[in-house]
Amino acid sequence: MTKSPIGGNRSGRKLGQKVKKGKLKASSRRWIERHINDPYVQRAQLEGYRARAAFKLLEIDEKHKILAGAKRIIDLGAAPGSWSQIAAKVTNSTDADPRVAAIDFLEMDPIPGVRFLQMDFLDPEAPENLKQAIGGAPDIVLSDMAAPTTGHRQTDHIRTMHLCEVAAHFAVEVLAEGGHFLAKTFQGGTERDLLNMLKQNFRQVVHVKPASSRAESVEMFLLAKGFKGRHALESDEPAEGAAEE
């Protein structure tokens, strides 16, 4: 996730610190008011999750059953850590027996059972470091990575789709057979080459927009279920696209 470190923001102001309205632009004031009144933000605070994004993963899992039985999980773009919290609980991960590896270029407060790497996933050393941290083939690769937005929709889409593609190829490289891949993408179309690659390597590929994803947001999630293994038949015919929900 492309978010500020926990406990503060890029301005250095502590979370929860009151700000004089006169110093805020109208758009910033509206964002703060929406955030404070967001029922998912309130639920996250009540249930101990670090971000409302936890409910996106939980809602997707409620329908698609991707978390049950997972023994190892890799979380890409993990900060501030709500998906890693869920992953650690699902895998019964502990500091003595860590089964979750997470990565983000932003800081992230420690989570019991999660090995966190503060580095850019696009760093050439990142994939190998994650493999070593997880200690075996993961059953799930999660990616909530998104490039910082520029305000230009096409540019933002291209940059985030690049992260999605890199994450997808990493998933195919490391997943255990039968594993799943879930990644953030933006509305505007998923590149055909990426969809074809996923269709060749997974048994089902769908686009998902959970209810907890804000209606005005362009984000969606690409879910690839049932990894066929690295010996998938080359003769498998790729589908034309992913189903949408």
UniProtKB/Swiss-Prot annotation:
GO cellular component, one term: cytoplasm
HAMAP family: RNA_methyltr_E
Stated name of the protein: Ribosomal RNA large subunit methyltransferase E
Family membership: Belongs to the class I-like SAM-binding methyltransferase superfamily. RNA methyltransferase RlmE family.
KW S-adenosyl-L-methionine (keyword) present: yes
Segment forming the signal sequence: none
Chain sites annotated for binding S-adenosyl-L-methionine: 81, 83, 104, 120, 144
Subcellular location: Cytoplasm
Active site: 184
Top-rank EC class of the record's enzyme: transferase
